[in-house]
Amino acid sequence: MEEKKDPRYLDLVISRKNDLLYPLIFQEYIYTLVHDHNLFPTILLENLGYDKRFRFLIVKRLITQMYQQNHLSLSAANLKQNPYFLYNKVLYSQKISEGLSIIVEIPFSLQLETSFKNLELVRVQNLKSIHSIFPFLEDKFPYLNLVSDGLFSYPIHLEKLVQILRYWLKDPASLHFLRLFFHEYWNWSHPSFEKKNLISFEKRNLRLFVFLYNSYVYEYESILFFIRRQFFHLPSKPFRFFFERLYFYVKIENLTEVFSKGSPVTLELFKEPNIHYIRYQGKFFFAYKGMPLLMNKWKYYFVTLFQNHFDVWFQTDKIHINPLYKHSFHCVGYLLSLKWNPSVIRSQMLQNAFIIENTMKKMDILVPIILMIDSLSKMKFCNKIGHPVSKPTWTDLLDSDIIDRFVRLCNKISYFYSGSSKKKNLYQIHYILRFACLKPLARKPKSSVRAFFKKLGSSFLEELFLEXQISSLIFIRSSPRSSDRSNQSKVRFWYLDIISINEIINHE
């Protein structure tokens, strides 16, 4: 007789089929994975005699040196006496971090692939901007009346992250290896983590950091979403009993059974609260439709969860609850505010005419021009008031290198901000970037920018500011009970090929 699996542990056991590939962590194939994925095209230092191309033979030599060294006996004196040893250590850390990021992403890639096996692709539609992947900003937010935003105040402790990862890693050797790697090699350059000044990583090598940070966020958000579903039923005292990760899903099942058996009539009277939660770059937002008293209760649950379980301190007086129609806030790189659009409709019935005035709420999504100009000024594209500037050293570059530098930046900005409701601020950014590109090009033939621009024509670099498109894949999930097409649910999967955070969009 086949043993029946307990469904209460389904969420905890689902990852065991595609468990982490621990042997890969201790094999040389980790460097092959990093090389094949091209995560670091140029990380070798020029002053050590290496060229800019990736040499697999160099990596093999570094692997041999890595096996011969004792990493537990590292000291600051050794690093100062031997700068080449410091470079090797940084190179080891980069390769280990990039290889680990690939390995830990393998189970999630397999789960994503299996989730689409039973889905039938209906169509692929193109959308004009990144803004289309946030339809709730237009569909949901205009009907809400309260918004609360705040920041994660203090960094995450490394041991707290190891404590969360111990539920995933069943191999003690791998867990000890990660703990050693965190404390010896890693420099948390992100404000969410504690910083160490021993080793400095490249800013672009954030793939492992993104995975670890999301694993931390997943833990508290899983509890947070459960509280949202049981918001009206969850009292204050039993709140602390839902924090243990191993028994969390079991308690959810038991609590659901108690509510369904004990008070079925009461459950029908309660309506699911219209609460929306957004997390973006260390910021969190709550949007709600209802009374401020209930929003204060939700704020209390959120602060208690972080302070008592995740050891993250919040200043409750800095978490404000504001009316949405009076408050604008920054989210996903945009400046969001609620705008009232008045409309007048004239209706005539027989000899009587009626004028109906109606006001509709619409989400106004703007480019944060002040923050954008500040970011461009730090990158030396303009001054503090937005006038384009140029460095004399840029004239030493080839024309193709100058244009290529601006092409990549303009494509990213146009791709990200083409979904703004007003294009005026975006056109101002286009103006700054275009003339910042023209100034170093005009200095080579020693002509003015106006004469150089007139020679090239007004269409110069216009193709760089075209609105890019993203794809939306629409699937149909087959219904096991009926083959009727009307009973089959559609699933929309948004595809976006921006996998790195742009410095100009990542506002500090």
Swiss-Prot record:
Localization, UniProt: Plastid, Chloroplast
A single BP term in Gene Ontology: mRNA processing
A GO term from the CC aspect: chloroplast
Gene Ontology MF terms: RNA binding
Source organism superkingdom: Eukaryota
Chief place where the protein resides: plastid
A Pfam family annotated for this UniProt entry: Intron_maturas2
Keywords per UniProt: Chloroplast, mRNA processing, Plastid, RNA-binding, tRNA processing
InterPro entries per UniProt: Domain_X, Maturase_MatK, Maturase_MatK_N
Protein family according to the UniProt entry: Belongs to the intron maturase 2 family. MatK subfamily.
Function in brief: Usually encoded in the trnK tRNA gene intron. Probably assists in splicing its own and other chloroplast group II introns.
Protein name per the record: Maturase K
Gene that encodes the chain: matK
